[in-house]
Amino acid sequence: MLQPKRMKFRKMFKGRNRGLANGTEVSFGDFGLKAVGRGRLTARQIEAARRAMTRHIKRQGQIWIRVFPDKPITSKPLEVRMGKGKGNVEYWVCQIQPGKVLYEMDGVSEELAREAFALAAAKLPLKTTFVTKTVM
């Protein structure tokens, strides 16, 4: 599971997921999976999508993960009264804005990449689209 090695502070404010995304271009591979909607991905979802893609392309080619879960999400235990401080860190998320490239792939055919990204997209809670590298 992806998570930061060290953080200056253990817990974080909830915050808002507004604004535009950085990393909107396919920069490492030839094909990419781009987020159309806004939301957040957990470390488990990122890993599940990666496994689905890796299995489908049968370990040929290369996959880049362009997102990293760096925000801790806390929750209090069941049947605990309110107050008494913030809950414990339960999992890590990455906030996604529209246009962010989530995964990239290289070394496979476009047809195989489309199929692999379709399997990955089924594991994610966001609406996504297939993109290719623009050559200038």
Curated annotation (Swiss-Prot):
InterPro entries for this protein: Ribosomal_uL16, Ribosomal_uL16_bact-type, Ribosomal_uL16_CS, Ribosomal_uL16_dom, Ribosomal_uL16_sf
Keywords tagged on the record: Ribonucleoprotein, Ribosomal protein, RNA-binding, rRNA-binding, tRNA-binding
A GO molecular-function annotation: structural constituent of ribosome
GO biological process: translation
GO CC annotations, alphabetized: cytosolic large ribosomal subunit
Domain of life: Bacteria
CDD domains named among the record's database cross-references: Ribosomal_L16_L10e (cd01433)
PROSITE patterns linked to this entry: RIBOSOMAL_L16_1, RIBOSOMAL_L16_2
Subunit (UniProt): Part of the 50S ribosomal subunit.
Functional note: Binds 23S rRNA and is also seen to make contacts with the A and possibly P site tRNAs.
Protein family according to the UniProt entry: Belongs to the universal ribosomal protein uL16 family.
Entry protein name: Large ribosomal subunit protein uL16
Organism of origin: Shewanella woodyi (strain ATCC 51908 / MS32)
UniProt gene name: rplP
